UniProtKB/Swiss-Prot annotation:
Source organism: Rattus norvegicus
Name of the protein this chain belongs to: Meiosis-specific nuclear structural protein 1
A Pfam cross-reference name: TPH
Self-association and partners: Able to form oligomers. Microtubule inner protein component of sperm flagellar doublet microtubules. Interacts with ODAD1. Interacts with BBOF1.
Gene that this polypeptide is encoded by: Mns1
InterPro entries, alphabetized: MNS1, TPH_dom
UniProt keyword list: Cell projection, Cilium, Coiled coil, Cytoplasm, Cytoskeleton, Flagellum, Meiosis, Nucleus, Phosphoprotein
Region (Interaction with BBOF1): 1-314
Localization (cell): Nucleus; Cytoplasm, Cytoskeleton, Cilium axoneme; Cytoplasm, Cytoskeleton, Flagellum axoneme
Phylogenetic classification of the source organism: Eukaryota, Metazoa, Chordata, Craniata, Vertebrata
Amino acid sequence: MANKKRAMSFSEKHQQLVDENFRKSLHVQVLNKLERQAKNQVVQNENDERVERQRFLRVLQNEQFELDMEEAVQKAEENKRMRDRQLEQEERLANELARLKHESLKDEKMRQQVRENSIELRELEQKLKAAYMNKERAAQIVEKDVIKYEQMKRDAEIERIMMEEHKRLLKEENVKQEKRDKERAQYYVDLEKQLEDQERRKQEAYEQLLKEKLMIDEIVRKIYEEDQLERQQKLEKRNAIQKYIKEFQRAQDLWRQKKREEMEEENRKILEFAKIQEQREGERMARVQESEEKRVQRQNLLIQKLEETLRQRDDLERVRQELYLEEYAEFIKLKMKEEVEQRLRKQRDRKQDFKDQMALREVLLQAAKEEEEAFKKAMLAKFAEDDRIELMNAQKQRMKQLEHKRAVEKLIEERRNQFLADKQRELEELQLQQRRQGCINEIIEEERLRLLKEHASKLLGYLPKGVFKKEDDVDMLGEEFRKAYQKKSEVCEEKGSS
């Protein structure tokens, strides 16, 4: 009975050990699954945050583009209003300059009006504003490139971390697998030891049974010797004892056979369980490998789609900026062409007015000369008619004619002087107007050079064509600026030729 109890206790311990190993395996699988789900959730959250940030940048870029277009339309309308105001202010400037008597006040007023209303200075300011706009756009492009590089860098870092984490998990899984293999091998060793112990205990039990049998034989012999007389009476008792011994031996054999069958069945179940566990572990590793390959494929596909989207968006943004710059440059060019044509037309009109004035002067001089001759003849005739009666002799007639001639010449001289004074006044007014225009041109040139000195060095590489009217403008800004500007121009020419 004690052997049977010990065998049952060993079976229960073995079953508990198997159950505990199975629970540990399930617990490890659950922990691995939870860890993978947490990592997948972190990656998904980072991807959602990156997509949301890209969407926000896209909205900001669209709003900036709409603001730029609206600003361009407003600038066009403002330029039109400025041209209208400029024409009105030029008329007011001419009237104001005619009224002003103090030269310093007049010069200051002229400078102020010229700075406010000069088309050339307005064009230069618009070009400088366009250069600042180009510089700002270039800075935005550089900033977007930096953001894109940082994003790619972060993606690469995430990929590296995920690969390292994957390698770490594989390494941990290999360590756990090795540990499980060692535990399984140790379990087999312990099982062999237990089988050996069971066999040893069986042998000891058999030897004990033999000893008990010898003891029983000895007891029977003694009983036979001591109670020879009562043999017949005790024969039945002895037969009963022998029967009991036989039954005990038969029961012992049956118990041994049953325990051997139970041990064989238990060993078979252990081997089957180990085989099933090994098969499950192989299937789990295959599923993990397949899931990892699918995850890497999805991640690579997502990265490719993201790169393609970023590239298409950058191409679209670059095309939009190029179109906007081309349209704005065409608008500035057309406006400059209109202003140049308007200035040339005004210059031609002024030249034509001057020619007309000179021709009119010649006509007036000729008419005045003819008028003088007619007036002279009329006055001589009138004086002659008035004094004809009073003349007494030829001497008085000659003296009277000379007197009339001197009076007529005096009147003619007075008319000529008046005419010359009027023409001189007109010439002085024309010269004054020319001096005013020259002063305005000087003020415009000074303001143009001032704007270039103030802004050109800050906008090197972003200045549009037409900002510098001559090479002296570049030299005026210094040797360092001239070299940098020349180098920038050579780089632009090389890009254009390539």
